[in-house]
Curated annotation (Swiss-Prot):
Catalyzes the ATP-dependent amidation of deamido-NAD to form NAD. Uses ammonia as a nitrogen source. SUPFAM superfamilies: Adenine nucleotide alpha hydrolases-like. One of its GO terms (cellular component) is cytoplasm. ATP binds at residues 29-36, 136, 165, 187. It comes from Syntrophomonas wolfei subsp. wolfei (strain DSM 2245B / Goettingen). Homodimer. It catalyses: deamido-NAD(+) + NH4(+) + ATP = AMP + diphosphate + NAD(+) + H(+). Keywords: ATP-binding, Ligase, Magnesium, Metal-binding, NAD, Nucleotide-binding. This is NH(3)-dependent NAD(+) synthetase.
């Protein structure tokens, strides 16, 4: 991969999509992870005067908060911090007052509340400014549905959606993303100790190898193909019940 050429292409692509939408710029969330770091730097390059980043802590790890702020300040990217803790606690308490799930399912439910709150904050900011919401998911995540429906998957543009995780790391090195971000285990930050690979039950190396070449152990291939099949609904618009013509007569 030619990192410089890819970055230039993504800059022009994002400008074209914003123009087509009649929008003025881009807003995105910065989490402290490598994907959002790469997306934020490219967005700033593409829209020097019309790029806004939101830091949206919600029971977030303090290291992620510090890394997020250090990144946007290093690259002189405009940002706002919107603490979602109070909104999250209010909603989760209300929801769990009538239906509470324990264990992993409970963690996933609560984590998805956080992701959807962030989506709401991003779209509020985008609509107020006539901006588009820029997603930060990579191809590896999108292919297996590793995202929250109407949460981090609720965006207008997926800048990194055709890049494998390892290719995102290549861009991160080229763009000068701080090592503190590049070297940390990828995590959605949905609960304490959560990591992408731990939740998926796969390493990104295994996933990227399969997506790039179809290679992998039988167990890995079966798992990936099962995840791809089970998450198709996340990559499609909701089905519409088409009324047969004879029922309209």
């Amino acid at each position: 991969m030619n990192p410089e050429a890819v970055v230039n292409y993504l800059m022009e692509w994002s400008r074209q999509k914003v123009k087509e939408a009649g929008a003025l710029g881009i807003v995105l969330g910065v989490s402290g992870g490598v994907d959002s770091a790469v997306a934020a730097i490219i967005a700033k390059k593409a829209f020097p005067e019309n790029c806004m980043t939101l830091l949206l802590p919600c029971e977030s790890d303090v290291v992620d908060r510090m890394d997020s702020q250090a990144l946007v300040e290093k690259f002189n990217i405009p940002y706002r911090i919107i603490d979602l803790d109070n909104a999250y606690h209010l909603l989760s308490t209300q929801f769990e007052s009538y239906l509470k799930c324990e264990g992993l399912k409970g963690k996933l439910l609560r984590g998805n509340i956080k992701s959807r709150l962030r989506m709401m904050a991003l779209y509020y900011s985008a609509q107020a400014r006539n901006y588009l919401v820029l997603g930060t998911s990579n191809k590896s995540e999108l292919c297996v549905g590793y995202s929250t429906k109407y949460g981090d998957a609720g965006v207008d543009l997926q800048l990194l959606g055709d890049l494998l995780k390892r290719e995102v790391y290549e861009l991160a090195q080229f763009l000068g993303v701080p090592e503190t971000i590049v070297n940390k285990p990828p995590s959605g930050g949905l609960w304490s100790g959560q990591t992408d690979e731990g939740e998926m039950g796969l390493t990104y190396e295994e996933l990227d190898n399969y997506l790039a070449s179809g290679d992998g152990s039988p167990e890995v291939i079966n798992k990936i193909e099962g995840m791809m099949a089970g998450s198709q609904h996340k990559r499609k618009m909701p089905p519409v019940a088409m009324i047969p013509p004879e029922l309209r007569n």
